[in-house]
Amino acid sequence: VPRAFDGSHLKLPGASGAFVLYEHQKRGIWRIIASGATYLAHAVGAGKTMTMAAAIMEQRRLGLIAKAMLVVPGHCLAQAAREFLALYPGARILVADETNFTKDKRHRFLSRAATAPWDAIIITHSAFRFIGVPSAFEQQMIQDELELYEQLLTKVESDDLVSRKRLERLKEGLKERLEALATRKDDLLTISEIGVDQIIVDEAQEFRRLSFATNMSTLKGVDPNGSQRAWDLYVKSRFIETKNPGRALVLASGTPITNTLGEMFSVQRYLGYAALLVRGLHEFDAWASTFGDVSTELELQPSGRYKPVTRFATFVNVPELIAISGPSPTW
């Protein structure tokens, strides 16, 4: 039975008495405190910012984290800072957008972030990419991805030239990224060197396109192509996981799963990669075979003709899927 979280007992020392949080907000706060990695799947207007602010401050008070980084869309930066300080007037927060990372400002900003005991650093999605991790760590992650592609290539039928060429192309892209990292200078403080041991991402659907290796890309509902933004978050969260296991990442969005089966796989990689790895489900094909049901139906094409289309239609083994994810997302 999935664990139920009840935050009605929370007192929230330091919070302004001008606000009374709703039950769902307290459930979300307690879920993050009790479990760490969490997906706040709360609707737009449900007060996610205050939920995240209170979760940060309570974890700080309890010694569960040292410094959080709250990543928000650019147009929400000022609002997020205002709401954070409205709920916790005494909070020590540092606010930054991409203008803080121009060549003449980035060293100063990172030094300021590292040398003061901030409760939270609030930063925009676009500025987040300037926060680095050690090149050696990202290189190892790319090597691990390359090994997955090599394993898939051994399983491709010899006459399936299309799949082989597609996998080879994706593999070359990873090799190019690896070469670029080999020449990159690590002359800036990394995310752990500035003291961050938890990342909280608002509007996390912007990071949902995390690439993965698969031989199923011809199926409808499977999109293995990813974005640099998603990969960037994945690397940083995996790095923080080595420093603060179980509390590296919290995601928040009103639209957690939108279009494809692969998005659920990406969420699990973000929040529970170790659980997938121990079960041998860290490869998409094994995961999809376990939790996805394939169906073929005739669909009307623009030409007016019907064509059989095979797609991932539904999730199966849902109780097991939820068990791997931990307790279900807070609603």
Language-model features and meaning:
Residues 46, 57, 86-88, 137-141, ...:
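Glycine-rich, phosphate-binding/catalytic loops in enzymes
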Residues 32, 43, 54-59, 80, ...:
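Hydrophobic residues on the short alpha-helix immediately C-terminal to a glycine-rich phosphate/catalytic loop
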Residues 2-41:
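Conserved pre-motif I regulatory segment
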Residues 51, 64-101, 105, 125-130, ...:
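Conserved Walker A/P-loop ATP-binding site and its immediately adjacent core
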Residues 35-55, 67-69:
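Walker A/P-loop
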Residues 59-66, 271-276:
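Post-Walker A helix-loop "phosphate-sensing" segment adjacent to the P-loop in P-loop NTPases
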Residues 106-198, 206-208, 229-262, 269-331:
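Inter-lobe coupling linker of SF2 helicases/translocases
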